[in-house]
């Protein structure tokens, strides 16, 4: 995460009420001092948070996957929950509630150990809330599944909550929200990633879990590449029926810089595909090995002119929505 996201982390830590491993990008001594001051002011809610600092100047694109790996590598438990600092759990979806659910349903833990990841359905609040206005409790927060169903009313005009993320629906659509809202399933239900772009928030086992492909920076492909790798590593996906997280919406920072970093990452796709072929024997040119939407990757890969370091040629800026906390 960036140092300006401390208020969001405080809300997350207070509601999660369990161990968190978070990697923080620091760009200067002044940035570090301001970060220290914020931590001191909010220390009451950050006692279970382990901070791992990554120092890098602003001139390069935001190191999304480097930070994710830094946090993930320092998780002390057998399992992890992976989500961004802009997402919050409800009081019924805390660390303790998840542990109790897995203790009461040992088959879930068995599946975790057998290369299954469990998906936490993600929603987002329609109304934007700035960093300065983030609080632990808020009238707009859905605190139960019943509230989610009510806030996501049948009439569009009545909706205060929507499926995450409306600006890129393939990112979470494979979660099968109609099935989740029906409540007519077992404690979890299996799904398939049926379209390009699926990048849910998950619970997984630390043992042998892949790491994020570190070459991707800034906007585009950085988190998505992880789920492509899970596919080739033969992981299964299941959705937890009684759990959810929600995105606290904020003003968009999309602009020309993001477009440029997306173009830079298109070049990295070629390197990523070579890695999949080498480590997994991924026949990414064979139809029978096709992952959903991989033709899109192949087309973008063809636009790359090599695998050199193109970062210095781009006007780079931090990517605001790429911070991860792990159980």
Language-model region placement:
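N-terminal anchoring/stem segment of glycosyltransferases
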Residues: 1-59
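Short active-site alpha-helical segment characteristic of glycosyltransferases
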Residues: 226, 230
